[in-house]
Amino acid sequence: MAHGLPDYGANTPKVTVYGLSDMAELAVRLGSFVSYDRQGDVMCLDGFESGLRGFLTGGDGLGNSVTQDSTYSRNGAFSAKMVCGSTLGRSATLNKFLQYPVMGNLGIEFSSTMHADIETLKVSAAIYDGTNSFIARLIYNEDTSILTYLNSAGAEVPLQAGLVLEEHPYLFHTLKYVVDYKNRKYVRAMLDERSWDMTDIPLYSTLSANPPNMLIAIGAIGKIAVNAAIHVDDFIITQNEP
């Protein structure tokens, strides 16, 4: 979110209250769920209050589903409940298609609960230009407590080990990462209170004839023979990130 001009009224001393010096703070106080990092200009945001009509859902295995759910949420009354299949690929997916963006620094953010029966949780941001695809992906492995990223060779490279996330249905962990699609490189990543500098790490690219568009894909894989479930909320895509 652009922070705008200063609130010049804050320069005048007040007896009982303090003036605001940041428009992002004002937006949050008025009820926006863009409350985690607050940088960049919002392209798309969804708290699933109106259902999942703007998303393509899917999965693999017996019992997989992705639905609007009112049991747990980070903000508002609803979230997206992702139930992984218990057989075959054991997955649940939540995909968002967007128009081909102006090339620059784009941010991808969402919040999710964690569960002991989840094996991996990943988010991919792919841009297709009609000839190639450029993919930025982060993967969290619940079993090993390692956060990895997809490198230019298509391999998963550790970004942080020993990253244990509390498993509680009312606790949503927030993940955000920024990608420089103009220069095809990662910029930075954040998970809760931690952050990592990913400057100059190149993206994975491959040939693709898909027409120009952008795809954000959130995917969870559960353990064998159980229908592992997590809740996802506060999906945010930003542009003009620093």
Per-region residue spans from a language model:
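Extracellular carbohydrate-recognition regions
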Residues: 2-60
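Flexible glycan-contacting loops in extracellular carbohydrate-active proteins
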Residues: 199-233
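Secretory/extracellular carbohydrate-interaction modules
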Residues: 77-150
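Extracellular beta-strand elements of beta-rich domains used
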Residues: 48, 230-237
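Localized edge beta-strand/strand-to-loop motifs within extracellular or lumenal beta-rich domains
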Residues: 171-187
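Beta-strand-rich interaction surfaces with strong enrichment in secreted/lumenal proteins
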Residues: 33, 94-100, 160-167
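Short, aromatic/His-centered strand-loop micro-motif at the edge of beta-sheets
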Residues: 151-174
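Extracellular glycan-recognition surfaces and repeat-rich motifs
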Residues: 52-88
